[in-house]
Amino acid sequence: MKSVSKSIFVVIALFLAVLLQGCSYIPKSLTSWYDAPSKDEGWVTLFDGNNLNQWTAIGNANWRLYDGSVQAEIGSGFLVSKKSYKDFQIKVEFWADEEANSGIFIRLSDSKNITADNSYEVNIFDKRPDPSYGTGAIVNISKIAPPMPLAANKWNTYEITAKGDQLTVMLNDVVTADVKDAKFASGPIALQSAGGVIKFRRVWIKPL
């Protein structure tokens, strides 16, 4: 009897060990891509998946909090930051489906009428295979070089730096835009939903 009990104990122990080992290999797509940047280095959290206290909704997109992100798939609209920024670095985690038409707009000139003509639009638009509008491009400013990157159906990261007239965009740690332009000096930031499914999970900003 003791031998049987001991065998059962060993089997259970081995099962638990395998289970715990497997938990340490959670796919990165299911976790936050970035570790939270240090406040000591000047980083500020604009969105952490829990509330939209630092944003104002414009338009009729059906923004809602769900499963640690904010997402929309109906209507067209923006989430606009309540503060304006001049020189900064911003990190954004996003997920888009194949139909998504979205983007991150910076240095808005008019937060009530947001377009790529009165701000810088860093695009999220796999569906339009045009170097001027593809994912990774700055619309009207910097075309995306082929092969064009695709963001659909996975978590991605944008890291955007605006310092003076220098604009740099990194998509999943790859530079997709590095250009000088002085049209817009400062303004709020906006997250767009204009078709398809778009989700934003984390947004951090560091004034420079």
Where are these regions (language model features)?
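Bacterial N-terminal signal peptides
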Residues: 11-21
